[in-house]
Amino acid sequence: MPVLHNRISNDALKAKMLAESEPRTTISFYKYFHIADPKATRDALYQLFTALNVFGRVYLAHEGINAQISVPASNVETFRAQLYAFDPALEGLRLNIALDDDGKSFWVLRMKVRDRIVADGIDDPHFDASNVGEYLQAAEVNAMLDDPDALFIDMRNHYEYEVGHFENALEIPADTFREQLPKAVEMMQAHKDKKIVMYCTGGIRCEKASAWMKHNGFNKVWHIEGGIIEYARKAREQGLPVRFIGKNFVFDERMGERISDEIIAHCHQCGAPCDSHTNCKNDGCHLLFIQCPVCAEKYKGCCSEICCEESALPPEEQRRRRAGRENGNKIFNKSRGRLNTTLCIPDPTE
């Protein structure tokens, strides 16, 4: 039986990937379909992906598959053919090709079985996830943006919305998708006569969200096929105006794809226009936040002076200070991106 998980350190794998001369293509895809045995499917796909030198993050569950991967350019068509042949449900599956891609998005393959491919918190036995809203193509999206009876709902996290979104799109203020679903229903109760257009990065969240809205009595529900990635690609190919403003946040090493030239976010430390996410360099924090080049130099890549000072300590002292600390210094609240200069150690009652 071959080894069906990685045994090499992350640092070694990253160095190996960066030394590669062959270009890579970043691809994302998902499919809601019944998988009878997710563990066996996971093992078979792991062998297929490994044979083609595919890196990335893949989740499988009884409800389907969700993947963000990096494929050697020379293997893309072979990968496509083998994926389509793997299961009849995957034949012809849309593969979202990254828009702004240096091919260095992943350097290890992680494939996990989960309860859901998207953590939605739905436990209603009568919910039909297949009863989704209507798909919208790029030209239809632009038409809806000009329709006064249409409301665009962003089903991504705050830090994603913060750096880029469709014109006049509504943000659902929540930290997770499972929190967003009931809030979306609540916020839209007064707008049941409107056309509800839902979107996300690649389509997986908004597809399920559209079904949830219909389950809760909303009849005029659409969602963007392929999400932001496919919309921007098709709009450019068809010579249409791209109505997404800013950057599309992505969950890999790139942390974002440039869609338009506008910078709509600001540095969390000084307030200068900036939409570059980074993780705090302090190993006891690693907070995701927005930092401009000036502040990156000033704080040495850290989110605060406290983290800057702590990251300069000897490794043993850093480890001693991290002991018993659950979530780093929490100088920022990740969900809303607000600076809090008074809070150093988390309040256990929060």
Curated annotation (Swiss-Prot):
Induction: Is expressed at all temperatures, but accumulation of yceA transcripts decline with raising temperature. Thus, its expression is repressed by heat shock. Changing G203A: Reduced 5-carboxymethoxyuridine formation. SMART domains: RHOD (SM00450). It holds the Pfam family Rhodanese_C. Coiled coil: none annotated. The keyword tRNA processing applies. Disulfide bonds: none annotated. Its EC number is 1.14.-.-. Disruption phenotype: Deletion mutant displays only slight reduction of 5-hydroxyuridine (ho5U) modification at position 34 in tRNAs. Cells lacking both trhP and trhO show complete absence of 5-carboxymethoxyuridine (cmo5U) modification in tRNAs; cells display a temperature-sensitive phenotype and decode codons ending in G (GCG and UCG) less efficiently than the wild-type strain. Changing C200A: Reduced 5-carboxymethoxyuridine formation. GO terms for molecular function: oxidoreductase activity; oxidoreductase activity, acting on paired donors, with incorporation or reduction of molecular oxygen. One of its GO terms (biological process) is tRNA modification. It comes from the Bacteria. It catalyses: uridine(34) in tRNA + AH2 + O2 = 5-hydroxyuridine(34) in tRNA + A + H2O. Keywords: Oxidoreductase, tRNA processing. The active site is at C200. InterPro entries: Rhodanese-like_dom, Rhodanese-like_dom_sf, Rhodanese_C, TrhO, TRHO_N. CDD domains: RHOD_YceA. Residues 146-240 form the Rhodanese domain. Catalyzes oxygen-dependent 5-hydroxyuridine (ho5U) modification at position 34 in tRNAs, the first step in 5-carboxymethoxyuridine (cmo5U) biosynthesis. May be part of an alternate pathway, which is able to bypass cmo5U biogenesis in a subset of tRNAs under aerobic conditions. Belongs to the TrhO family. PANTHER family: TRNA URIDINE(34) HYDROXYLASE, UPF0176 PROTEIN YCEA. This is tRNA uridine(34) hydroxylase.
